Amino acid sequence: MEPHKKFLFLVVVGGRSPKANIELHDVRWVIGSKIEDTFDQLRNDWFGSYNELHIDSYKKIESIDGYKINLRNKENNEPKNKIFKKRKFPNKKLWFVNIGGYDPSSMQEKHEFGFVVASSPSEAKNKANSKWLIDSQKKHTDDIYTVKSFTDVDECEVIKNINDWEIELIPNGNHLEEKNIPDWFGYMRIDKK
């Protein structure tokens, strides 16, 4: 691994909020060379109490749907990848999709989420629906964001600026489906520096 190479991480964080009766969770996408580099950003983005703030799982995202994820720091004027400049790609974007659904034997709404590469919100929803919560009833899309850069989203709430990183999608030719399985899961406290 290159010493300062940055990666996109998808992180599930958990914690408490003063008026909540149960532990709450959120999903964040952050950038760092290693997961520990993202802790400050995760703490800053958390909406509840810092006490007992923790990571439940994370995954380093390197490729999605046959595209390599390349990160470019716009602030440092890093040049775009040569392959990206030479070829015209369809208007593909990286989307985060959160699918909800129900199981009649459970009180809670089930969720499955992750990234897909698609040209439009409807294509992103269709891809996610074809992969996730296959056996759930009343399946629906709870959240969908396009993640072009970490300062832009598609007609939804604003994603906080994360060091002005831009995402380049580079076809990697392997078309292997990257499994939506965490690299790590458990209980990792991040409430204290």
Regions found by a protein language model. Name each.
Residues S17-V30, E36-L53, S106-G114, I134-Q137:
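A cross-kingdom feature marking solvent-exposed beta-strand/loop segments within repeated
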Residues M1-V12, A20-N21, N44, Y50-G101, ...:
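Intrinsic disorder/low-complexity detector
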